[in-house]
Amino acid sequence: MSPNTQSETFKRKPVENLLSARSVAIVGASTKGRWPSGIYRNLKAAKFPGNIYLINPNYTEIFDDKCYPNLAALPEVPEHLLMLIPTRAVLSTIEEAAKLGTKAATIYSAGFGEGEDPKGKDRAQAMKELCDRTGFVVCGPNCMGSFSLPEGLWSFPTPVPLLKKGPVGLIFQSGGSLGNWVKGASERGIGFTYAVSSGNEVSLDLVDYLSFLVDEPDTKVITLMVEGIRRPQEFMTVAEEALKKNKPILVVKLGRSEMG
């Protein structure tokens, strides 16, 4: 799928490096906490066909699978990192991964500009510059992962029902709401192509994901849950392309009041 089929004025980043990865490494895999085990179990439940590597220097085995001390110890370069590590270690890990040849990461860790902490904003800017320099793409930080139904790549960290394939693509700027929506929709028989929790959007943003879904042939309807659109002009360019392809875009705007 070409990243520039819509307009010479807009070129999306390679979302497919993230959503269509053929191997993953869970960096910060652990028997402690619900998210590391949740991600592993969701990948297994979805029958992800690629290799799933576990990385944590404090373990030699987790979930009856071998655990490696670091990225360099892996038998191959993973295409996508699922990162559950302290904020202070994230940037150096991305730098190392990019040098090894990894192209994408989902970063669950917070501390990258979502609050008023100026150090967090500095970390977010450093991550953006690192991604721009290396071509690395990131979902998040401070996100809850994604679902790629065609690939069986489910990086969501909490339990979900066994989703079925269908025509709906989702992009949510609220990770918790995404989990509730896919559960509720599944109970009503609705199936999906891709569903993304975009987090802080330091690298990939809503417009990149939307462009991917507009070009994705099996996605017929797109639903967005939006707090804000950072690139309104590019958003309109992509939305016009969706209109040409008869793909409806449904937008749910998150409120800012106490009532929502």
Mark where each language-model region is:
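Catalytic-core regions of core metabolic enzymes
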Residues: 1-260
